[in-house]
């Protein structure tokens, strides 16, 4: 679209939603001792930033093109045995530009029962940053890891061990236009 209409197409954004599908308890975490943990499966709706537009900044923590918003963490915590220890904007993750890219988010998620759980990851923009347009800078790539620093895959089912919460850094959108014109 950018090649056909460069003055109308936004910079690149987070791409797909960052919806961690979490599950735990008997039979749901194949390589972990689950003990008497409560069985659960829950999908969380969260995302990073959109790309900046030709005349406006990108939207922070908002999906493009649908505009899907985030699920309040209190809802997730009330329906599954998880606790969200952190949910912040990922400062400066949007690319610089005359119009800056939207910022991503940082989330840290653990079991409220101190039990292992699993994540079914399907995240994009981990290896390739959302590109800026017309001189705008790229947004930050996403990260999927444990709070201990162990890097996880951005695709596939993986176990989050007891006592080492999941740490997600969602991408920021690319900037649009020369940052010196801001």
Functional labels for PLM-detected ranges:
Residues 1-182:
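Glycine/proline-enriched, intrinsically flexible loops and inter-domain linkers
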